[in-house]
């Protein structure tokens, strides 16, 4: 049985799972997924190695859960940013979340450490980001007539791909990613 999506019977379990996943994320960014050790994750999370195994049956399960955790963080950030806004303001909020996630990633670090793993992670992230943005674009169109000649899926894909391209090819100007992601969405720079 895989425990990639650990059962959470209480907030302590959720908090501990988050601590473990946060520790794993920091270590993956520091040393890469191949060198990730469950012992190091346990030490950084402040738990015993057997505790890690109560939540994740293997390193692969932990890495899989880490990808799902990052998507949940992205989705939660989208939900918070778009709360109480409609139309184009909703799109601006969503695009700014994408830009913030790109800005928060150490540029190319994982790509330098493990290109295959980084490519796999981005290949998994692209359809999830595209789907999330497509839903936003459809909501925007229903709310205040946000009109574009572009098919929502194509526009969402362009926004997501622009964001991911900045992870692969970081710009020396830290504000460039946000400007270009907003431009891909047809929004003025911020």
Q: Across the structure, where does each feature detected by a protein language model lie?
A:
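Basic, helix-initiating cap at the start of DNA-binding domains
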Residues: 1-44, 61-64
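Short amphipathic alpha-helix in the helical subdomain of ABC transporter nucleotide-binding domains
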Residues: 13-17, 151-156, 160, 174-178
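Short hydrophobic clusters on alpha-helical segments that form packing/core surfaces
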Residues: 20-28, 70, 74, 78, ...
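Short hydrophobic/aromatic patch on the recognition helix
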Residues: 45-56
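Hydrophobic alpha-helical connector segments
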Residues: 65, 79-104, 118, 155-156
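Amphipathic alpha-helical packing segments from all-alpha helical-bundle domains
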Residues: 75, 118-157
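Helical hydrophobic small-molecule/effector-binding pocket
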Residues: 88-113, 123-128, 138
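Amphipathic C-terminal alpha-helical segment
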Residues: 100-104, 139, 157-176, 186-190
């Amino acid at each position: 049985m895989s425990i990639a999506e650990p059962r959470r019977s209480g907030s302590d379990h959720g908090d501990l799972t988050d601590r473990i996943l946060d520790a794993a994320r920091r270590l993956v960014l520091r040393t890469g997924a191949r060198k990730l050790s469950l012992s190091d994750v346990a030490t950084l999370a402040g738990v015993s190695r057997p505790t890690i195994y109560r939540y994740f049956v293997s390193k692969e399960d932990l890495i899989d859960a880490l990808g799902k955790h990052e998507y949940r963080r992205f989705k939660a950030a989208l939900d918070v940013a778009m709360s109480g806004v409609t139309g184009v303001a909703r799109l601006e909020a969503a695009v700014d979340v994408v830009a913030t996630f790109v800005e928060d990633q150490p540029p190319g670090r994982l790509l330098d450490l493990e290109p295959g793993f980084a490519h796999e992670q981005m290949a998994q992230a692209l359809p999830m980001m595209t789907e999330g943005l497509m839903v936003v674009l459809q909501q925007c169109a229903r709310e205040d007539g946000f009109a574009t000649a572009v098919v929502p899926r194509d526009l969402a894909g362009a926004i997501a791909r622009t964001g991911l391209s900045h992870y692969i090819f970081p710009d020396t100007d830290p504000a460039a990613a946000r400007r270009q992601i907003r431009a891909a969405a047809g929004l003025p720079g911020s």
